[in-house]
UniProtKB/Swiss-Prot annotation:
Name assigned to this protein: Tryptophan synthase alpha chain
Keywords: Amino-acid biosynthesis, Aromatic amino acid biosynthesis, Lyase, Tryptophan biosynthesis
Role this protein plays: The alpha subunit is responsible for the aldol cleavage of indoleglycerol phosphate to indole and glyceraldehyde 3-phosphate.
Signal peptide: none
Active site: 52 (proton acceptor), 63 (proton acceptor)
EC number: 4.2.1.20
Cellular component terms (Gene Ontology): cytosol
Subunit structure: Tetramer of two alpha and two beta chains.
Catalytic activity reported: (1S,2R)-1-C-(indol-3-yl)glycerol 3-phosphate + L-serine = D-glyceraldehyde 3-phosphate + L-tryptophan + H2O
PANTHER family named among the record's database cross-references: TRYPTOPHAN SYNTHASE ALPHA CHAIN, CHLOROPLASTIC, TRYPTOPHAN SYNTHASE, ALPHA CHAIN
NCBIfam families cross-referenced by the UniProt entry: trpA (TIGR00262)
Protein backbone atom coordinates (compact mmCIF):
# COMPACT_ATOMS: atom_id res chain seq x y z
CA UNK A 1 0.00 0.00 0.00
CA UNK A 2 1.29 3.53 -0.72
CA UNK A 3 2.77 5.08 2.38
CA UNK A 4 0.32 7.95 2.77
CA UNK A 5 -3.38 8.53 2.26
CA UNK A 6 -2.63 11.20 -0.34
CA UNK A 7 -0.49 8.78 -2.35
CA UNK A 8 -3.16 6.09 -2.20
CA UNK A 9 -5.93 8.40 -3.40
CA UNK A 10 -3.75 10.09 -6.02
CA UNK A 11 -2.98 6.67 -7.50
CA UNK A 12 -6.71 5.99 -7.89
CA UNK A 13 -7.21 9.43 -9.39
CA UNK A 14 -4.32 8.90 -11.83
CA UNK A 15 -5.93 5.66 -12.98
CA UNK A 16 -8.99 7.66 -14.06
CA UNK A 17 -11.27 6.25 -11.39
CA UNK A 18 -13.54 7.90 -8.87
CA UNK A 19 -12.50 7.66 -5.23
CA UNK A 20 -15.05 5.97 -2.97
CA UNK A 21 -14.91 6.12 0.83
CA UNK A 22 -17.67 4.46 2.88
CA UNK A 23 -18.29 5.45 6.49
CA UNK A 24 -18.92 2.89 9.23
CA UNK A 25 -19.55 3.32 12.94
CA UNK A 26 -17.07 1.35 15.04
CA UNK A 27 -18.90 -1.07 17.33
CA UNK A 28 -22.24 -0.88 15.48
CA UNK A 29 -22.31 -4.62 14.94
CA UNK A 30 -24.00 -7.49 16.72
CA UNK A 31 -20.52 -8.50 17.88
CA UNK A 32 -19.58 -4.97 18.89
CA UNK A 33 -15.94 -4.14 18.16
CA UNK A 34 -15.29 -7.84 17.58
CA UNK A 35 -17.15 -7.37 14.29
CA UNK A 36 -15.11 -4.40 13.08
CA UNK A 37 -12.49 -6.42 11.21
CA UNK A 38 -15.27 -8.37 9.48
CA UNK A 39 -16.88 -5.16 8.22
CA UNK A 40 -13.57 -3.65 7.12
CA UNK A 41 -12.62 -6.78 5.18
CA UNK A 42 -16.09 -6.94 3.60
CA UNK A 43 -15.61 -3.40 2.25
CA UNK A 44 -11.99 -4.04 1.33
CA UNK A 45 -13.01 -7.05 -0.78
CA UNK A 46 -15.42 -4.79 -2.68
CA UNK A 47 -12.52 -2.54 -3.63
CA UNK A 48 -13.23 0.67 -1.71
CA UNK A 49 -10.53 3.37 -1.73
CA UNK A 50 -10.41 3.96 2.03
CA UNK A 51 -12.76 3.52 4.99
CA UNK A 52 -13.93 6.20 7.39
CA UNK A 53 -14.37 4.73 10.88
CA UNK A 54 -16.48 6.68 13.35
CA UNK A 55 -15.92 6.82 17.09
CA UNK A 56 -19.29 6.97 18.89
CA UNK A 57 -20.09 10.09 20.89
CA UNK A 58 -23.16 11.00 22.92
CA UNK A 59 -23.54 14.47 21.36
CA UNK A 60 -22.75 14.11 17.64
CA UNK A 61 -23.62 17.61 16.38
CA UNK A 62 -22.79 16.93 12.71
CA UNK A 63 -24.58 13.59 12.45
CA UNK A 64 -28.08 12.91 11.22
CA UNK A 65 -30.41 10.37 12.85
CA UNK A 66 -29.01 7.27 11.12
CA UNK A 67 -25.45 7.79 12.30
CA UNK A 68 -26.54 9.17 15.67
CA UNK A 69 -28.53 5.99 16.32
CA UNK A 70 -25.58 3.89 15.16
CA UNK A 71 -23.42 5.66 17.73
CA UNK A 72 -25.92 4.94 20.48
CA UNK A 73 -26.01 1.26 19.51
CA UNK A 74 -22.22 1.19 19.57
CA UNK A 75 -22.07 2.80 23.01
CA UNK A 76 -24.65 0.27 24.22
CA UNK A 77 -22.27 -2.47 23.04
CA UNK A 78 -19.62 -0.99 25.31
CA UNK A 79 -17.48 0.72 22.68
CA UNK A 80 -14.88 3.10 24.05
CA UNK A 81 -12.05 4.98 22.40
CA UNK A 82 -9.52 2.86 24.28
CA UNK A 83 -11.18 -0.37 23.19
CA UNK A 84 -11.33 0.83 19.58
CA UNK A 85 -7.64 1.70 19.55
CA UNK A 86 -6.76 -1.74 20.90
CA UNK A 87 -8.99 -3.34 18.25
CA UNK A 88 -7.40 -1.32 15.43
CA UNK A 89 -3.98 -2.59 16.50
CA UNK A 90 -5.13 -6.13 15.66
CA UNK A 91 -6.69 -5.43 12.25
CA UNK A 92 -4.63 -6.13 9.15
CA UNK A 93 -5.82 -4.40 6.00
CA UNK A 94 -4.36 -2.89 2.84
CA UNK A 95 -7.03 -0.18 2.91
CA UNK A 96 -6.20 3.11 4.67
CA UNK A 97 -8.53 3.92 7.54
CA UNK A 98 -9.66 7.43 8.42
CA UNK A 99 -10.89 8.02 11.97
CA UNK A 100 -13.85 10.37 12.38
CA UNK A 101 -14.17 11.61 15.95
CA UNK A 102 -15.46 14.61 17.82
CA UNK A 103 -12.84 16.42 19.82
CA UNK A 104 -14.14 15.43 23.26
CA UNK A 105 -13.31 11.69 23.01
CA UNK A 106 -9.92 12.63 21.59
CA UNK A 107 -9.29 15.12 24.39
CA UNK A 108 -10.34 12.62 27.06
CA UNK A 109 -7.97 10.00 25.63
CA UNK A 110 -5.15 12.49 25.11
CA UNK A 111 -4.26 13.62 21.60
CA UNK A 112 -0.60 12.68 21.89
CA UNK A 113 -1.39 9.23 23.28
CA UNK A 114 -4.06 8.66 20.63
CA UNK A 115 -1.66 9.42 17.80
CA UNK A 116 1.14 7.34 19.32
CA UNK A 117 -1.14 4.37 19.90
CA UNK A 118 -2.31 4.41 16.27
CA UNK A 119 1.20 4.71 14.83
CA UNK A 120 1.48 1.09 13.72
CA UNK A 121 -2.10 0.65 12.54
CA UNK A 122 -3.80 1.17 9.17
CA UNK A 123 -5.08 4.59 10.28
CA UNK A 124 -3.86 7.24 7.83
CA UNK A 125 -6.30 10.09 8.41
CA UNK A 126 -8.21 11.93 11.13
CA UNK A 127 -11.42 13.97 10.79
CA UNK A 128 -12.59 16.15 13.69
CA UNK A 129 -15.78 17.93 12.58
CA UNK A 130 -16.14 20.15 15.65
CA UNK A 131 -12.51 21.33 15.73
CA UNK A 132 -12.29 24.86 14.26
CA UNK A 133 -9.47 25.48 11.81
CA UNK A 134 -8.08 28.08 14.21
CA UNK A 135 -7.65 25.37 16.86
CA UNK A 136 -5.97 22.81 14.59
CA UNK A 137 -2.77 23.48 16.54
CA UNK A 138 -4.28 21.37 19.33
CA UNK A 139 -3.73 18.35 17.09
CA UNK A 140 -1.33 19.09 14.23
CA UNK A 141 1.94 19.10 16.24
CA UNK A 142 1.33 15.48 17.25
CA UNK A 143 0.74 14.44 13.63
CA UNK A 144 3.85 16.16 12.27
CA UNK A 145 6.09 13.08 12.13
CA UNK A 146 3.41 10.51 11.35
CA UNK A 147 1.55 9.22 8.30
CA UNK A 148 -1.77 10.42 9.75
CA UNK A 149 -3.30 13.38 7.91
CA UNK A 150 -5.68 15.88 9.51
CA UNK A 151 -8.53 16.15 7.00
CA UNK A 152 -10.11 19.60 6.57
CA UNK A 153 -13.88 19.93 6.17
CA UNK A 154 -14.82 22.75 3.82
CA UNK A 155 -18.35 24.09 3.53
CA UNK A 156 -19.25 25.04 -0.01
CA UNK A 157 -20.83 28.23 1.32
CA UNK A 158 -17.34 29.37 2.29
CA UNK A 159 -15.74 32.10 0.17
CA UNK A 160 -12.78 31.24 -2.03
CA UNK A 161 -10.19 33.04 0.11
CA UNK A 162 -11.37 31.24 3.24
CA UNK A 163 -11.33 27.95 1.32
CA UNK A 164 -7.70 28.55 0.40
CA UNK A 165 -6.90 29.24 4.05
CA UNK A 166 -8.63 26.04 5.21
CA UNK A 167 -6.85 23.78 2.73
CA UNK A 168 -3.38 25.32 2.85
CA UNK A 169 -0.89 22.58 3.68
CA UNK A 170 -3.62 19.95 3.97
CA UNK A 171 -2.83 16.29 3.36
CA UNK A 172 -4.93 13.22 2.61
CA UNK A 173 -7.97 14.77 1.01
CA UNK A 174 -10.36 17.67 1.34
CA UNK A 175 -13.81 16.83 2.68
CA UNK A 176 -16.27 19.01 0.77
CA UNK A 177 -19.53 19.30 2.71
CA UNK A 178 -22.32 19.14 0.14
CA UNK A 179 -25.20 20.33 2.32
CA UNK A 180 -25.87 22.70 5.17
CA UNK A 181 -26.80 20.74 8.27
CA UNK A 182 -26.23 17.18 9.40
CA UNK A 183 -25.36 14.01 7.52
CA UNK A 184 -27.95 11.99 5.66
CA UNK A 185 -30.08 14.81 4.17
CA UNK A 186 -30.04 13.45 0.64
CA UNK A 187 -30.91 15.80 -2.20
CA UNK A 188 -31.01 19.01 -0.15
CA UNK A 189 -28.35 20.65 -2.31
CA UNK A 190 -27.67 24.27 -3.21
CA UNK A 191 -28.52 25.25 -6.78
CA UNK A 192 -24.94 26.42 -7.34
CA UNK A 193 -23.32 23.41 -5.65
CA UNK A 194 -21.55 22.13 -8.76
CA UNK A 195 -20.04 25.55 -9.40
CA UNK A 196 -18.68 25.77 -5.85
CA UNK A 197 -17.28 22.23 -6.01
CA UNK A 198 -15.53 22.97 -9.28
CA UNK A 199 -14.08 26.14 -7.76
CA UNK A 200 -12.75 24.25 -4.73
CA UNK A 201 -11.32 21.57 -7.00
CA UNK A 202 -9.39 24.19 -8.96
CA UNK A 203 -7.60 25.61 -5.90
CA UNK A 204 -6.87 22.24 -4.23
CA UNK A 205 -3.68 20.25 -4.82
CA UNK A 206 -4.96 17.09 -3.13
CA UNK A 207 -8.14 15.07 -3.89
CA UNK A 208 -11.49 16.68 -3.15
CA UNK A 209 -14.17 14.25 -1.92
CA UNK A 210 -17.83 15.19 -1.54
CA UNK A 211 -19.84 14.00 1.45
CA UNK A 212 -22.99 14.64 3.52
CA UNK A 213 -26.21 13.49 1.87
CA UNK A 214 -24.63 11.41 -0.91
CA UNK A 215 -26.80 8.31 -1.28
CA UNK A 216 -27.93 7.58 -4.84
CA UNK A 217 -26.52 6.52 -8.19
CA UNK A 218 -27.36 10.00 -9.47
CA UNK A 219 -25.34 11.51 -6.60
CA UNK A 220 -22.35 9.31 -7.48
CA UNK A 221 -22.42 10.45 -11.09
CA UNK A 222 -22.98 14.11 -10.24
CA UNK A 223 -20.26 14.47 -7.64
CA UNK A 224 -17.68 12.32 -9.41
CA UNK A 225 -18.06 14.71 -12.33
CA UNK A 226 -17.10 17.80 -10.31
CA UNK A 227 -14.87 16.33 -7.59
CA UNK A 228 -12.48 13.40 -7.23
CA UNK A 229 -14.93 11.11 -5.48
CA UNK A 230 -17.51 10.67 -2.76
CA UNK A 231 -17.95 9.71 0.88
CA UNK A 232 -21.13 7.81 1.75
CA UNK A 233 -22.17 7.33 5.36
CA UNK A 234 -25.84 7.05 6.30
CA UNK A 235 -26.77 4.78 3.39
CA UNK A 236 -23.94 2.36 4.25
CA UNK A 237 -24.58 2.42 8.01
CA UNK A 238 -28.30 1.79 7.57
CA UNK A 239 -27.78 -1.08 5.12
CA UNK A 240 -25.19 -2.81 7.28
CA UNK A 241 -27.37 -2.52 10.38
CA UNK A 242 -30.55 -3.75 8.70
CA UNK A 243 -28.85 -6.45 6.64
CA UNK A 244 -29.88 -4.82 3.38
CA UNK A 245 -27.91 -5.59 0.20
CA UNK A 246 -25.40 -2.82 -0.43
CA UNK A 247 -22.82 -4.62 -2.57
CA UNK A 248 -24.16 -3.45 -5.94
CA UNK A 249 -24.17 0.20 -4.91
CA UNK A 250 -20.59 -0.06 -3.63
CA UNK A 251 -19.43 -1.90 -6.75
CA UNK A 252 -20.94 0.83 -8.93
CA UNK A 253 -19.19 3.49 -6.87
CA UNK A 254 -15.85 1.69 -6.96
CA UNK A 255 -16.05 1.06 -10.71
CA UNK A 256 -16.82 4.68 -11.62
CA UNK A 257 -14.58 5.82 -14.47
CA UNK A 258 -13.75 9.47 -14.99
Amino acid sequence: MPKTLTEKLNAIKAAGKGIFVPYIMAGDHEKGLDGLAETIHFLEDLGVSAIEVGIPFSDPVADGPVIEEAGLRSLAHGTSTQALVETLKTIETEIPLVIMTYFNPLFQYGVENFVKDLADTAVKGLIIPDLPHEHANFVEPFLANTDIALIPLVSLTTGIERQKELIEGAEGFIYAVAINGVTGKSGNYRADLDKHLAQLHQVADIPVLTGFGVSSQADLERFNAVSDGVIVGSKIVKALHQGEPIQDFIKQAVAYQK
